[in-house]
Curated annotation (Swiss-Prot):
Gene Ontology process terms (BP): phosphatidylethanolamine biosynthetic process
Protein name, entry field: Phosphatidylserine decarboxylase proenzyme
Organism: Rhodopseudomonas palustris (strain BisB18)
Membrane-protein topology: Peripheral membrane protein
Superkingdom of origin organism: Bacteria
Residues with PTM Pyruvic acid (Ser): S190
Entry's family note: Belongs to the phosphatidylserine decarboxylase family. PSD-A subfamily.
EC number: 4.1.1.65
Site label Cleavage (non-hydrolytic), positions: G189, S190
Amino acid sequence: MSIVNSIRAQIPPIHREGYPFIGGFALISLLLFWLWTPLGWIGVVLTIWCALFFRDPVRVTPVRDDLVVAPADGRVSMVVSMVPPAELGLGDKPLLRISIFMSVFNCHVNRAPVAGRVERIVYSPGKFINADLDKASEDNERNSMVISTPGGQIGVIQIAGLVARRIVSFVRVGQVLGAGERFGLIRFGSRLDVYLPDGAKALVSPGQTSIAGETVLADFRQGDGGRSYRAA
């Protein structure tokens, strides 16, 4: 393998949603260099940050019907029992909810926590308060999705934050997703909530770091089964 290929292998690919932003930052950097060199270097740093924000590395996902993997890179902020939002249609009984907060330094490509069929997608306009606050799940702009699996229905909510002003979804109702498959992203800091079927057991705790498509969040096992892995 050549040196160029070795370097390329170490650099994660960039998601296509980031191309316009990276190009914009690069153009601004050139203009800043023309005005004053130190400002240009600040622009270069911001361009690199933007590229890192939209990075889309390959992830190796554990594949088993009863495992729930992290839908986002970030920090587990809450593991609680909560009544799911009405738009999910999951009833009024409290369910296990695991929340992941993404800072502006995390990779923001979102991945399916389970394999299954998309049963519902509901967009709800709202505010843009700090996504790390509990009330953000009800007050903020969000995109809610329900995935049907053999073990029950999983609710996944993309929640906009203080800086995040754009939720992007790549999927449609009726689409079948694989565990760890990309389904959307949120631009510039946000949160994801995952609502799990009754009886699910959380395998993470608040403060733990999560890696989208790899970190196992919970188990709703119906029986013993082996674990395999799939790169995505």
